[in-house]
Amino acid sequence: MASNDTIADMLTRIRNACAVRHPTTKVPTTKMTRSIAQVLKQEGFIEDFSEAGEGVGKHLVISLKYKGKTRQPIITTLKRVSKPGLRVYSPCKDLPRVLGGIGIAIVSTSQGIMTDREARRQGVGGEVLCYIW
């Protein structure tokens, strides 16, 4: 099924896969989902990701990360902030701190997709896409 909000679709697929402890999940590939997956990997929320398929059927295979013998998911919450019907923009000085810095906010800036910490360091604001902790 085609989705108008690929970011929400990606977050939902990751959330559902973590809930049932799947080792991987597939997400349709776009530049935005690839960039978000890169940030998640850099921040240690996922193990790795790779592209599979060709043309229209191209997708990202995301390897999820768990901890301990009980395989508790590293990602406890994924929350979409800016939606197609209600965009949320924030200047550099007003970028949110997620759980006092424990979690991250993923921000789409003129410099690309990055975490709230990187955006503050570079002095740029942008669209707050989602919160993750």
UniProtKB/Swiss-Prot annotation:
Highest rank taxon of the organism: Bacteria
UniProt GO molecular function: rRNA binding; structural constituent of ribosome
Annotated keywords: Ribonucleoprotein, Ribosomal protein, RNA-binding, rRNA-binding
InterPro entries tied to this protein: Ribosomal_uS8, Ribosomal_uS8_CS, Ribosomal_uS8_sf
Pfam name, any one: Ribosomal_S8
GO biological process: translation
Protein's job: One of the primary rRNA binding proteins, it binds directly to 16S rRNA central domain where it helps coordinate assembly of the platform of the 30S subunit.
Record-stated family: Belongs to the universal ribosomal protein uS8 family.
Name assigned to this protein: Small ribosomal subunit protein uS8
